[in-house]
Amino acid sequence: VELNLVIFNLGDSMYDAFEKTKEDNGAIYNKLENSYLQHKRQFTLFKRFEKESLFTLYMLNEGISRLKFKDPSRGNGTMQFLKAFADLGTKAALGEDSKSCLNVISGHTVLTCDDEVVPFVNGTHLIISLNSQKNNKDLPDSQYLKYYSRYIPGTFIDCKIYITDNFVENI
């Protein structure tokens, strides 16, 4: 059985909302800006990313929130959701040909996760790098992070998980 779930919020994209709070959220914003500058040095003629797309990726990581200046406990929910998806998707795919998939679509960015790129622990936080090295210092693989000319207002998270016999047995 194929299970499809969509969560959406219309309005500002993740990036646009984060940009609006950069003055109040200076420490977090500077952290993301520094990550972007490190990644930008790795750009080549054939592999480069828009700032919006990389910031969207960074914002998914645990401990990052556009509203952290208001509430220090924020910045965990989305990564916990991605981790739960990865765990469920792995259980579903054991011994099966079905492949679970999750997309985060926000603004111009489409970020895709599957069983090849899942959240992992880095220090005390869960992060996602979208690369096979599982290293947030390296650029993401371009098949998992894309920039589209069409703008999507808000954020959509859609996931597809297959409910299989293996899934039921491994819960």
Task: Locate each region found by the language model.
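Short beta-strand element(s) in the Bergerat
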Residues: 3-5, 155
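Glycine-rich acidic phosphate-binding loop
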Residues: 8-14
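Flexible, glycine-/charge-rich segments associated with ATP-binding catalytic modules
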Residues: 16-171
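Short, well-ordered loop/turn elements at secondary-structure boundaries
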Residues: 1-3, 98
